[in-house]
Amino acid sequence: MEFDTIAAISTPPGEGAIAIIRLSGPEAIQIADRIFYAKNSLSEAESHTIHYGHIKEDGEVIEEVMVTVMRAPRTFTREDVVEINAHGGIVSVNRVLQLLLRNGANLAEPGEFTKRAFLNGRIDLSQAEAVMDLIRAKTDRAMGVAIRQMDGNLSRLIRNLRQEILDALAQVEVNIDYPEYDDVEEMTQRMLLEKTELVRASVEQLLQTASQGKILREGLATAIIGRPNVGKSSLLNQLIQEEKAIVTDIAGTTRDIIEEYVNVRGVPLRLIDTAGIRETEDIVEKIGVERSRKALADADFILLVLNQNEELTVEDEALFEAAAGHNYVVVLNKTDLETKLDINRVRELAGENPIVSTSLVNDEGLEALEEAIKALFFAGDIDAGDATYVSNVRHIALLHQALEALNGVTTGIQLGMPVDIVQIDMTRAWDLLGEITGDSVQDELLDQLFNQFCLGK
């Protein structure tokens, strides 16, 4: 398969030390050579070499560059690739790109370099998606999961499962097409059930990693809730180590939602500092309270903050009711002041959920809170060598559908259906697993997936 030659700026826009303009395609080296001036021609350069020179337009030097030449097939796209390393200015970099486009290159679409790597067989679809997961990783663990997926851990596992299914299907077909051959082993219902159960168990095992994998990939929407002036904004500022939220002694200072990402002991949290939840006649504050209630309802995880220096109120107890059904940690703040809170009542309301005491003004209790968060979601380190985690929503959905098809095989066999009938569900499971790696996938889906990538990737 041969494509045209594409070009794009691969580094983020704006000022910086270095900017990279990338080309890929059959004419990549020749097009770069038309605007690059140095002692030796790029067209004669050996693969994986770097060359110093200048970019010129109509004889005028517009940039001093280092150019990397990489010849097919030992490149990311398996095509000829050229990377022009220029100074990180906006004007000069765009001018170099425009020169390349005028000399025969086409502007790359978002994700087109990675798409070509997939279409040319360099990587499969799950590995391609892992590239974006790596770019978006917010913790070391998330990065590790993405790297292992890029390395093909998930791909190998899925291909092994598909091969198990294919072996069973092939034996069923032989039995159907050549029933008269005595030397062909008969695929009995019992044998097919055993093979199906092996594959089904592996799919279920993968799905058991989905909740942790999804946390690593997307982060937990974490609502910080409580009555006004209990220390919610102080908690946000402490966790992110930045004065993001305004903190005063005046109740109702926070009127709107404040969001910030933070990595807490490997758990990526999307912190949402909410307006204090209480009854109010202030129109603006009332809007903030309604948004807080919605954030609470939509949250994956809740930090429920109480003031230890005040008695428990009806509004506090209502927050426990609202948090029911969520994972949450109770934060008893202001332990530097006299305790007026009924701790036994708090324990009764919290049930099995952790309770942590803090004095945020004195920087006390934050480590205990972070440990409680980690223990709640990761019972031990998940960064376990070659462990394979499913974190992609598309992959999870396909695994659920494949499991449903395999359950159909099991049910059909138990009901005494002929082997050639239950193979329909078996074939469906094989196809669904193939969609994860891209072995069976529609062009429309490919376009949709790769359009989510950044330009130049």
Curated annotation (Swiss-Prot):
InterPro entries hit by this protein: G_TrmE (IPR031168), GTP-bd (IPR006073), GTP-bd_TrmE_N (IPR018948), GTPase_MnmE (IPR004520), MnmE_dom2 (IPR027368), MnmE_helical (IPR025867), P-loop_NTPase (IPR027417), Small_GTP-bd (IPR005225)
Which positions in this protein are listed as binding Mg(2+)?
A: S233, T254
* The protein's role, per its UniProt record: Exhibits a very high intrinsic GTPase hydrolysis rate. Involved in the addition of a carboxymethylaminomethyl (cmnm) group at the wobble position (U34) of certain tRNAs, forming tRNA-cmnm(5)s(2)U34.
- Quaternary structure annotation from Swiss-Prot or TrEMBL: Homodimer. Heterotetramer of two MnmE and two MnmG subunits.
- Annotated TrmE-type G domain ranges read 219-378
> Entry cofactor note text?
Binds 1 potassium ion per subunit.
Please identify the protein, giving its name as recorded: tRNA modification GTPase MnmE
Q: Which domain of life is it from?
A: Bacteria
Query: Could you tell me the Gene Ontology terms of the biological process aspect for this record?
Result: tRNA methylation; tRNA wobble uridine modification
Q: Name one GO cellular component term.
A: cytosol
Q: What family does this belong to?
A: Belongs to the TRAFAC class TrmE-Era-EngA-EngB-Septin-like GTPase superfamily. TrmE GTPase family.
Keyword list, A-Z: Cytoplasm, GTP-binding, Hydrolase, Magnesium, Metal-binding, Nucleotide-binding, Potassium, tRNA processing
HAMAP family, per database record: GTPase_MnmE
The EC number on file is 3.6.-.-
Does the UniProt entry include the keyword Transport? no
Give me the residues that bind (6S)-5-formyl-5,6,7,8-tetrahydrofolate, please: R22, E83, R122, K457
Q: Which residues bind K(+)?
A: N229, T248, I250, T253
State its location(s). Answer: Cytoplasm
Q: Where does GTP bind?
A: 229-234, 248-254, 273-276
Q: Which cofactor does it need?
A: K(+)
**Could you state a single Gene Ontology molecular function term?**
GTPase activity
| SS bond partners | none
Alphabetized PANTHER family for the sequence: TRNA MODIFICATION GTPASE GTPBP3, TRNA MODIFICATION GTPASE GTPBP3, MITOCHONDRIAL
